[in-house]
């Protein structure tokens, strides 16, 4: 067998084994819908397969999505940490608390299933005027539906 043909077969075989998460996601459409709903410099939204093994979408900059914010229980976590903690739950999880001791800034968390049964999400938003996690959940549900999930 020619090396090029072997490489093509190997690539196709590996691609067939890769996990798939529902239908294709239109990143531009989802960026627009999420940005309009809860867009903020300190917002991170992560979508993953319900198995939690494949992140299929991330909204927000690297620093926001990797920064550990207060978890409202005395610890800290990132949006991906929150996703991993809530991925198997059937109901949405919503939390809100102060992110600074003086209460001048807050953090809100929301995670749960999306309208696409194969996907779950987690979101974190931090800032001086952050809406509660329940509001973020409602706005994201509408954004996901608008984007075709």
What are these regions (language model features)?
Residues 1-15:
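Sec-dependent bacterial lipoprotein signal peptides
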Residues 12, 54-55:
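N-terminal compositionally biased, intrinsically disordered segments and leader/signal-like regions
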Residues 45-51:
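Short hydrophobic alpha-helical segments used for membrane anchoring or interfacial signaling
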């Amino acid at each position: 067998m020619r090396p090029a043909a072997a490489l093509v077969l190997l690539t196709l075989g590996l691609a067939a084994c890769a996990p798939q998460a529902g239908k294709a996601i239109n990143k531009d459409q989802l960026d627009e819908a999420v940005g309009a709903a809860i867009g903020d410099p300190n917002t991170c939204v992560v979508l993953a397969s319900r198995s939690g093994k494949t992140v299929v979408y991330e909204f927000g900059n690297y620093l926001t999505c990797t920064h550990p914010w207060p978890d409202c229980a005395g610890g800290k976590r990132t949006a991906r940490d929150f996703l991993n903690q809530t991925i198997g739950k059937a109901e949405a999880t919503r939390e809100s608390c102060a992110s600074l001791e003086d209460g001048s800034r807050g953090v809100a968390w929301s995670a749960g299933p999306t309208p696409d049964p194969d996907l779950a999400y987690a979101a974190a938003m931090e800032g001086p005027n952050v809406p509660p996690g329940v509001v973020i959940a409602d706005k994201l549900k509408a954004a996901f539906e608008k984007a075709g999930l």
